[in-house]
Amino acid sequence: MDPGSTASPLQCTAGFPSKNRVAILAELDKEKRKLLLQNQSSTNNPGASIALARPNMNKDFRDHSEQQHIAAQQKAALQHAHAHSSGYFITQDSAFGNLILPVIPRLEAE
């Protein structure tokens, strides 16, 4: 930086992250185009459809093993909650990833 420059050192370093971001975005765009080209070539190649059918079986197996793992985690969490709490809990799928949910009784209005 020359003495006649009015830019502060902070302003010079502030531009660096934006250049870095541009480089990262360019690299991501390049990868995206590469993947799109690979996807197009695999759909044009009839032999590729056979290879694409296999991962679904692996996915089903993985989903099943994940469900078993979650069921084991739910059972352990439920046992722990019942042992250490006076409340009542149930296992239920939760949009927030909770393995167990507390049951809260409804009281009639007096």
Curated annotation (Swiss-Prot):
GO terms for cellular component: nucleoplasm; nucleus; SOSS complex. It comes from the Eukaryota. It is found in: Nucleus. InterPro entries: SOSSC. GO terms for biological process: DNA damage response; DNA repair; response to ionizing radiation. Keywords: DNA damage, DNA repair, Nucleus. PANTHER family: SOSS COMPLEX SUBUNIT C (PTHR31526:SF2). Belongs to the SOSS-C family. Belongs to the multiprotein complex Integrator. Component of the SOSS complex, composed of soss-b (soss-b1/nabp2 or soss-b2/nabp1), soss-a/ints3 and soss-c/inip. Component of the SOSS complex, a multiprotein complex that functions downstream of the MRN complex to promote DNA repair and G2/M checkpoint. The SOSS complex associates with single-stranded DNA at DNA lesions and influences diverse endpoints in the cellular DNA damage response including cell-cycle checkpoint activation, recombinational repair and maintenance of genomic stability. Required for efficient homologous recombination-dependent repair of double-strand breaks (DSBs). This is SOSS complex subunit C. It comes from Xenopus laevis (African clawed frog). The gene is inip.
